[in-house]
């Protein structure tokens, strides 16, 4: 799935690089044995694999493989993720739903299904005279063991903040919003986006 990427980066709690380390982020190829070393204890995998649609990612990625070869590659990578994962871990896969359906037995061979999340985005391309415009992808959430969930850390604003019950939650209990739905509307990262970097198919920062 590409050549080895740059060195990992580390995230620390607090404003400096001397605080408690809370995250280690790796970039690049999942085939790098140092990234997916068995027993490494990784807590979360956030993946956006090539979709095998013939997209030009550059010379390091083959995005047009025979379907069986592609499915086997995906199985091998996510099996390696499982072996490198902590006893309680999350795996998120961003992909198109029809392709995830084809690979379902492979994806859930070791990992356990947890939730199906839909990422919807406005799109002015891909229109068809035979079907509705495709303007969404799936974020498949798989788990190993029983990872902790901190849903209260990412919330959406209340839709009726003037309601008496909601006002109490806001002003007396300090709540700033309610739980997210299992569908998220997030714009694509385009060439004019503020968070755009030198990458051919970048996932929007808000989604991450």
Q: What would you call each of these model-derived segments?
A:
Residues 1-6, 10-207:
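Core catalytic lobe of class I
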């Amino acid at each position: 799935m590409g050549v080895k990427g740059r060195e990992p980066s580390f995230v620390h709690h607090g404003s400096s690089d001397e605080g408690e380390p809370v995250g280690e982020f790796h970039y690049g190829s999942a085939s790098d044995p140092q990234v997916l070393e068995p027993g490494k204890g990784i807590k979360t995998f956030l993946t956006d694999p090539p979709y095998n649609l013939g997209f030009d990612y550059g010379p390091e990625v083959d995005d047009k493989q025979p379907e069986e070869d592609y499915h086997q590659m995906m199985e091998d990578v996510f099996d390696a993720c499982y072996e490198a994962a902590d006893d309680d871990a999350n795996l998120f896969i961003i992909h198109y739903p029809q392709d995830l359906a084809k690979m379902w037995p492979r994806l859930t061979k070791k990992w356990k299904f947890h939730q199906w999340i839909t990422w919807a985005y406005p799109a002015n391309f891909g229109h068809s005279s035979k079907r509705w415009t495709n303007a969404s992808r799936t974020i498949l959430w798989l788990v190993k063991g029983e990872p902790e969930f901190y849903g209260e850390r990412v919330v959406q604003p209340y839709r009726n903040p003037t309601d008496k019950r909601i006002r109490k939650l806001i002003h007396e209990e300090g709540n700033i919003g309610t739980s997210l739905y299992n569908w998220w509307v997030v714009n694509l990262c385009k060439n004019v986006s503020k968070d755009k970097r030198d990458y051919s198919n970048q996932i929007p920062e808000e989604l991450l």
